[in-house]
Amino acid sequence: MKSRLQAFKQFTRFVSCKSCGVELQSKNPSVTGYYKPPRAVRKDAGTIEDLKYLMFTQELQLKKHEIGLLDPDTDPDYKEPIPKRLVCKRCVDAISHNRYNSSDFPIHSFNDIKGALPHAANVYHVVSLSDFPLSLDKTILAEKNNRNYLLLSKADQITYKSSMLPHKGSAFFAEFCRRHIGVHVKKVVLFSNPRNWNIPSVINALAKRCYLLGNPNVGKTSLINSLLHEKSTSFQAQLDKRGNVIGPPKGHEQIQSTRRRAIFNEGGVSHIPNFTRTMQTYLIEDKVVNDLPGYTMDPTKVSDLANYIEKETLDNIRKTSKFKIDKLIKQNYTSLTGSKTGKCLSFGGIFHLVPPNSTINQVVNYIPLPEHEFSNVEKAVSLSLEVLQSENHSLRQFFALKKPFTDIKMFDRHVIPPFNGAIEIVLKDIGYFQVKPTGKYGFNGLYELWVPKGIRVCIREPLSKLISKSYEKYIESGDIADVCPTDRPLISDTYIMNHTEEDTFARMREMYINRTSKDILSRRLLQKDPNDIVGTLQSPPSNLYWYYKW
């Protein structure tokens, strides 16, 4: 039996699934790669009228082509079927019918896929901006044997201005990697697949032979499909044992329409994580691009969201098409006032934001989840079980959490370090929302987010504003150091505390000292009275106790 690692080392020609890349077989439905061979279709002769019309349209196409008027991509008279390519049953069920089991999409570790990487490879680490930096793997960017690049996807989920991507965004994140993470990357490119933003910049950044590497659902295969549509001569290929390109696939060259040709070569894209099962190779112009399966940084700690959230709601969270860019433009918010009883704002009954007493907050939710206020977290969680047991409950639309996460014991209490102005709260593989206190500044306590155990959470300064303001400062000073602030941490983990902890501020100091015990140089502001720091509005923000473990 071949190990997964050995499977990724194979560079032999075989009939593979167009969508996931797995080797196909038609003998055993219970074995990986099963597909149903297409049936031979007998064409009816048709009526005389049908034949006359067919001859007329074919003659019309031929005449237009002869005089240079026929454009296969735009002419309505051009009729061209796309040749069929074989797809395994798993992918057909998932893509066409949204019918799947999570067990059919196993998790890959980095060790599972690293066998496909040659020594001294051109590695393009694809990272989602939606949950940045939780899908960024420092070990990939720190590998000195490789030439490392950073491709930041889903840029349309942090800004509605594509003009920010090529210069401001790239400069900011290049300096961010160097100064905050301690790694040097050869190039940074921000892009958006759904809106086709900055795709030419990605092509220009690609080396002659490169490898796309990243977590599941960060947009690697979607990027491949964008590249195929951008460059009409591109196609899906295979590699022989020596690494030479074999291709294009049968049927490619007979397609005249560039758009249809790109569709013919597209890889399978789905909101389901771990969809790609083996390395898939593409020739983009004269560049060999290898799309590797998404991998999980620490499979022992991964939490399958399918075990937490109802299927329909989870599908909506994962589908990039559900993100509404209007929210970035209009900034429509929910007003939330803190109370002594711990009033909370619940997001789909999945996680709950608790602001300090007497604070007035604007919450902008960029996650496709309904919001609802409850008197406290205990009330919200206890109601979730009641709601799930009654299909006709009046609050049914506000709850999507599965058992056993309908018990407060299954939740972690994430305490958020102090902040000035707005922050973005980020949840791994889910997205982010923004919290902005309003009115006269005053420190009334710490914010909390109650989340089912196992879901990673962090906070960050609002990315779009941070990038724009920093670039403006850089233009004024001419000092590249100003393109990304280094006077404070810009990202932080949260502090998970006991449900009964009362003095969260003092406990946070203890936890901060413990977290930084092996990173003394990252410690800040410990010589000052913390109450003095949070007692006054700081500009720029002090970000007391902010610390992120890369």
UniProtKB/Swiss-Prot annotation:
Its source organism is Kluyveromyces lactis (strain ATCC 8585 / CBS 2359 / DSM 70799 / NBRC 1267 / NRRL Y-1140 / WM37)
State the compartments where it is located. Answer: Mitochondrion
Q: Which residues cross the membrane?
A: none
Q: What are the GO MF terms of this UniProt record?
A: GTP binding
What Gene3D superfamilies does this protein map onto?
Answer: P-loop containing nucleotide triphosphate hydrolases (3.40.50.300)
Under the cellular component aspect of Gene Ontology, which terms does the record hold? mitochondrion
State what this protein does. May be involved in the mitochondrial lipid metabolism.
The answer on whether this UniProt entry bears the keyword Mitochondrion reads: yes
UniProt family annotation: Belongs to the TRAFAC class YlqF/YawG GTPase family. GEP3 subfamily.
Name this polypeptide is given: Genetic interactor of prohibitins 3, mitochondrial
